[in-house]
Amino acid sequence: MNNSVITVIGKDRVGIVYDVSKILAENQINILNISQQLMDDFFTMIILVDTSKCSKSRQEVLDLFAEESKKLALDIRMQNEEIFQAMHRI
C-alpha cells in the first residue's frame, strides 16, 4: 500500500481522535498529517497516513474501518492518496 487518506465524520464527542489513532497504531499505520474541525455538533477529520508497515491487506484495513465505524458511530473511510487528490482537485 502507498500513502492513504482517511476521512472521519461523526457527531462530536470526547475520544474520537483517540479511538481512530488507536486503530491506526495497533495496525502499524503511521500518521503523517492530521487536520480536524468542528462544524456545529459534527466532527470532521482528515488524516494522511503511511501504510507501508501495515501487515494487513488494503481490503482487510477497509473491512476493519467498516467494522469500527459501526462500533464507534462514525463514518471512517480510507482512499489511496492519489485517488483522493484526483477526486478533490478543482
Curated annotation (Swiss-Prot):
Family matches, as InterPro entries: ACT-like_dom_sf (IPR045865), ACT_dom (IPR002912), UPF0237/GcvR_regulator (IPR050990), UPF0237_ACT (IPR022986)
ACT domain: residues covered: 5-83
One Pfam family it belongs to: ACT_6
Gene3D superfamilies, alphabetized: 3.30.70.260
GO CC terms: cytosol
GO biological process, one term: DNA-templated transcription
Parts of the chain that traverse the membrane: none
Family of this protein: Belongs to the UPF0237 family.
Name this polypeptide is given: UPF0237 protein NMB1653
